[in-house]
């Protein structure tokens, strides 16, 4: 069995911050993986019999190229694929937008605590501290929201510098989502920085 890691970074150096940490997690768990740049994905990779799951990594704040190239991700909706997919930050945005979600500007940088209202992968309902680094959020009714944060305005952005700050339960900004009928998961935060166990669980367990 093999995990396909999809690199969406325009700049090669960003690979070391957003992709390599995920590769390192899988390597330590002795999980076989293949990493490929999103523009180079072909049916050969997607229909590989060894392919079990897919992770779409995030990228830097200044890199929005992937948002202009969503046609490269049409395969996400292929019925014959039917593999669990886990999108991280930009990866979650891609998953939502492919299913015709709405992109909204919402810059969040730093650590906050968010409330998981239901079990999400191996996260039981609880308060979790997560690391955020993004300019945009996504809204999509095809996905169920498992955890969220309040939309930040003006001076409220300063709250992100306080790791003790607890986000609102109003779930205005989805931080953890799952497609209502498909094994497609997304997180706006970066589990490769904090909460590595989420990646280990997705890769190692049987995902419904």
Each model region followed by its residue ranges:
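Gly/Ala-rich beta-loop-alpha elbow adjacent to hydrolase catalytic centers
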Residues: 87, 91, 96
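Pocket-forming structural segment of enzyme catalytic cores
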Residues: 97-197
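Structural motif
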Residues: 6-11, 38-39, 58-59, 188-190
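Short, charged N-terminal beta->alpha structural module
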Residues: 5-28
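N-terminal Rossmann-like NAD(P)+-binding domain of SDR-like oxidoreductases, especially those catalyzing
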Residues: 9, 54, 60, 197-199
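Flexible gly/pro-rich beta->alpha loop and the following alpha-helix that scaffold active-site loops
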Residues: 24-87
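Extracellular ligand-binding/catalytic regions of CAZymes and related secreted enzymes
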Residues: 195-208
């Amino acid at each position: 069995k093999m995990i396909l890691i999809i690199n969406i970074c325009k700049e090669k150096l960003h690979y070391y911050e957003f992709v390599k940490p995920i590769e390192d997690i899988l390597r330590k768990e002795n999980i076989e993986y293949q990493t490929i740049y999103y523009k180079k994905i072909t049916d050969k990779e997607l229909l590989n019999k060894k392919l079990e799951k897919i992770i779409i990594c995030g990228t830097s704040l200044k890199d929005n190229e992937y948002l202009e190239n969503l046609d490269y991700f049409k395969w996400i909706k292929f019925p014959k694929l039917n593999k669990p997919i886990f999108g991280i930050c930009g990866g979650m945005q891609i998953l939502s937008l492919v299913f015709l979600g709405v992109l909204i500007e919402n810059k969040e940088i730093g650590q906050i605590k968010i409330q998981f209202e239901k079990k999400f992968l191996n996260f039981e309902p609880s308060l979790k501290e997560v690391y955020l680094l993004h300019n945009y959020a996504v809204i999509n009714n095809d996905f169920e929201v498992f955890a969220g944060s309040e939309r930040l305005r003006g001076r409220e952005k300063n709250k992100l510098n306080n790791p003790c700050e607890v986000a609102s339960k109003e779930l205005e900004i989805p931080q953890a989502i799952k497609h209502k009928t498909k094994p497609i998961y997304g997180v706006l935060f970066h589990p490769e920085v904090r909460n590595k166990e989420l990646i280990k669980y997705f890769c190692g367990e049987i995902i419904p």
